Each structure stands twice: as structure tokens, then as C-alpha cells.
UniProtKB/Swiss-Prot annotation:
It is found in: Cytoplasm. Belongs to the ClpX chaperone family. HslU subfamily. ATPase subunit of a proteasome-like degradation complex; this subunit has chaperone activity. The binding of ATP and its subsequent hydrolysis by HslU are essential for unfolding of protein substrates subsequently hydrolyzed by HslV. HslU recognizes the N-terminal part of its protein substrates and unfolds these before they are guided to HslV for hydrolysis. The gene is hslU. PANTHER family: ATP-DEPENDENT CLP PROTEASE ATP-BINDING SUBUNIT CLPX-LIKE, MITOCHONDRIAL-RELATED (PTHR48102), ATP-DEPENDENT PROTEASE ATPASE SUBUNIT HSLU (PTHR48102:SF3). GO terms for molecular function: ATP binding; ATP hydrolysis activity; peptidase activity; proteasome-activating activity. It comes from Stutzerimonas stutzeri (strain A1501) (Pseudomonas stutzeri). GO terms for biological process: protein unfolding; proteolysis involved in protein catabolic process. Keywords: ATP-binding, Chaperone, Cytoplasm, Nucleotide-binding, Stress response. This is ATP-dependent protease ATPase subunit HslU. It comes from the Bacteria. A double ring-shaped homohexamer of HslV is capped on each side by a ring-shaped HslU homohexamer. The assembly of the HslU/HslV complex is dependent on binding of ATP.
Amino acid sequence: MSMTPREIVHELNRHIIGQDDAKRAVAIALRNRWRRMQLPAELRQEVTPKNILMIGPTGVGKTEIARRLAKLANAPFLKVEATKFTEVGYVGRDVESIIRDLADAALKMLREQEVHKMRHRAEDAAEERILDALLPPARPVGFSEEPVQSGDSNTRQLFRKRLREGQLDDKEIDIEVAESPAGVEIMAPPGMEEMTNQLQNLFANMGKGKKKSRKLKIKEAFKLIRDEEAARLVNEEDLKARALEAVEQNGIVFIDEIDKVAKRGNTSGADVSREGVQRDLLPLIEGSTVNTKLGMVKTDHILFIASGAFHLSKPSDLVPELQGRLPIRVELKALSPQDFERILTEPHAALTEQYRELLKTEGLHIEFLEDGIKRIAEIAWQVNEKTENIGARRLHTLLERLLEEVSFSAADLAGKQQGEPIRIDAAYVNEHLGELAQDEDLSRYIL
């Protein structure tokens, strides 16, 4: 990650409106991973990441920050919900499976990168195999031991040219490809995922190396052979060693819904399991060793980012040890009408642009006017205030309701449209949403 914190925030601004404190915190944390790797080896071991706790109502951008961060980081990244895990001894997944999943994500990411690097070599090899199938080598005549070239050189070059131009894409050929391992579905009780994976790998390896002849169109055959050749060029042992290093040094885990495992002050009973999940998370966040398919993974330098709405509990309801292991606290603010306006227009691939382009595929043109966008933002904010505050997700509900008739009749309307777009202004919004927004009972159930 060679991007500076300012560049990371700038990139996040393309997709997420507001929440500058949270963006700055994750940008600094991400940059610190790079800074740490520049230190001498001895000092590097002593520098541990400062984990982050993001607090804020639902729908304000906590999860979206995590999603965008994953794309920016180019590092092993895993997003999990805290509610999926149970205390050791209860039925369900244990928290160590987080690190096992992170190891799988790292291996997959590095394999994709390696295959991408080998793409050109794999394409050349695939091209040669297809040309061999199109122009089989001639058999030697009599007792001659001289090697026979695969097809006449000029003919081969002619076929190569036609293959690259796509003229042979629909021609069928018989080709030998690696046989897909039989998919073995193993049902196992929760918490036994590791054993299930090992058994599935065992069955997959049993059929490895077998080939079978298939009749395929050249376009499909080329993709299959290219992937097969690329996989053959990748050094699996080297890949596993690099993936292990990447997980330990650059891994990032985003734990969502952390507030759902917080012990609430006035309840008891099932909360024992919640507190147990927190206690199981402690050694993972503090630093422990977990057995994965890559080997033993040390979690000392994995960055943990936890987030939660905390509308039924408080951060202080988390066990004190866990609070101490999440030293950086960032509060995300509830959205204002102005924020809703910006969400509708400013981000890359904003909601209004998505609907405009979707309907354009039917030949129907719609235009969102400024007063229309302002009115949608006002209604979204009002409904959130009157009923449950679900943040920016309210806009999805409103826009679906607003454009329901247009979406349903898009093909018919496109035929009648005389070059004039359908204009979504304040009057149009009031006509379709005004009554629902005013009636609290209706908005509670429909919006």
C-alpha cells in the first residue's frame, strides 16, 4: 500500500459521503502497515497495529468503508459478522475460523495475481495446443527418424492469424483437457469446517492429473486450456509461503455487528454466549497462533477493525479487555438532508445514475432535476426521523417506490417518448411519495 492517507481518503470520497473521521482513521491505519514494513526487522516485530472501533447508526457508511478498503488495500482482507460466531462449547462456528478464512482469501488473491502475471505465457501455450489440434503432426513415412513438423509452417501461420482474429471461434475441435474433480458434498456439524475442507481436498486430489477428450468450440477450448496452463505455471508451494507471510504481516479483518455480542445491562441468560464470543476474540486480537491450511498463522500483526451501531448497547458494555484492544474509537454521524442530496449525486455510480442507465437500456430517458433530488433527500430524512433510522438505505426504498410505474412500463413509455426525457422534479416526487411520507402509519410499513 504505497498510497498516502490523503490519497486513500480521496479515493474513499469517490464512494462515501461525509464520515471524514472514520476515513482518516482507516487511511492512517492502512498507511501504517506500509510504514511498518520499511522498519528494520527487529523493530518491525515490536510495532503492532492499533485496532479500530467504528461506532455509528446503521446505514451511514461503516460497512461501505470496509468494502472500499478491501479493494484499495491489495492485502488479505476479510469481512465477518460477529453474530455468526459462538463461544467454544456451543453449536456454531468458533472465532478461529476467521483466521482460516483470511488464509483462504490470501491464497485466492495471490493465486489470481499470479495467474494474471502468467496470462501471456498461458495464452501462447493454449494457442499452440489449439493449432496442434487443428493441424495434427504428420506421421513419419517408412523408417525415417527425422522429426516431422506440426503442419506446414505457412499453413500454421495462416491458422494462427485466423485464430487471433477470431475467425475460428465457432469451429469445433477435439481437445484433451484436465478432468474436473468430482464435487463431493460433505455435510458436517458447525465447527467442523476444517475437517470438511481436508476431506474435500483429499477427494479432489484423487482425480488430479486425469485427462479426458472433449469436443468444444475453439473460443471455449481456448479459455479452458489457458486457465489450465496458467495453473500449471503457478508454483503452489511458493504461493502458500507468500500467502502465509501476507496474512501475518498485512492481513485485515473487519468485524461487523460487534455491538450484537455486547452484554446488555438489563438482560441475562443467553448473554453468557455473547460474552464468551468476546472472550474468544481477545487472544485473536491480542496475538495468538492459529492452525490453517497454510500452516501456523500468528495474529500479532493482523489489523482488526470492529464496527457496530450500538443503539441497544454501549461500547462500555463490551468486556473491558476487548475495549482495551480496540484503542482507536471513531464515531460516525447520522446523515442530514444535505448528506442525502450528495449521496444521490456525488459518488461514483450514484443511485440516480444507476437508475438512469438501467432505464436507458430500454430506450427510456429520465432526468433527475435539482429540486426533485432535494425533495427525495428531504423525504428520506423525514421518514428516518419519524420511523426507524436506517440511514442511506432508505434511499433505495424511496427510489424503487418513486420509479415503480416507470420501471414497469419502461418499454411502452420508450415507444411513446418523442425525444423528451421524463423529468423527476419536486412535483413528480410529491405526487408519488408525498402522501406516503406524510402518513406515519403508511410510511412505517411501505417506506
